[in-house]
Amino acid sequence: MSDNAQLSGLCDRFRGFYPVVIDVETAGFNAKTDALLEIAAITLKMDEQGWLMPDTTLHFHVEPFAGANLQPEALAFNGIDPSNPLRGAVSEYEALHAIFKMVRKGIKDSGCSRAIMVAHNATFDHSFMMAAAERASLKRNPFHPFVTFDTAALSGLALGQTVLSKACLAAGMEFDGEKAHSALYDTERTAVLFCEIVNRWKRLGGWPLPLPTDK
């Protein structure tokens, strides 16, 4: 096993995975048929003492793909008007191309091997991002095709809460319900929450793992 002093790097913490926090806002629940309307991504970094923290942020409003379903209930829930020109929306290709480029650079700079999505109820966000990447014919997808870090599950374990707002409050963080269901705000809160859970485990002595003793 590596010496503990060598386990403070991001590449050592998650088996070579590079965690990237993602949140999406959509026009429904079906990743294949319903529109992706907004996406934000935040990369993470570690300081020299091994504490995890947010790093770089990208955020895009996204144009519905041709033929996409726009479920009225979903639009009422997130308050997005896809036809509003003030959104400054870009294509799925433009949004994901920029995010993937940022992520690939982070993987290289940190010495990691592949990105892993961090999200709250991650299956949902992962399915929409992967479906959009497929529609956009983006071949160099840096994210693992199925492995994720789900902060809903991690929060249930560490904090006894699974709802994002309640988990943030349980962790001693602020959460503004008026800003919820914005991809940018939810991603920022999820990033801070994930870092707090990882860092709390370190403060409690759970990381680095103890070195094996000779018998």
From Swiss-Prot:
Gene Ontology biological process terms from the UniProt entry: DNA replication proofreading; tRNA processing
Report which superkingdom the organism of origin falls in. Answer: Bacteria
Give UniProt keywords alphabetically.
Exonuclease, Hydrolase, Magnesium, Metal-binding, Nuclease, tRNA processing
Asked if Zinc is a keyword of the record, the answer is no
**Gene3D superfamilies on file:** Ribonuclease H-like superfamily/Ribonuclease H (3.30.420.10)
- Answer yes or no on keyword Metal-binding: yes
Q: Which cofactor does it need?
A: Mg(2+)
Record's cofactor remark: Binds two Mg(2+) per subunit. The active form of the enzyme binds two Mg(2+) ions in its active site. The first Mg(2+) forms only one salt bridge with the protein.
Q: What is its EC number?
A: 3.1.13.-
Which residue intervals define the domain Exonuclease in the entry?
20-194
NCBIfam families reported in the protein's UniProt record:
RNaseT
The molecule here is called Ribonuclease T
Q: Which gene encodes it?
A: rnt
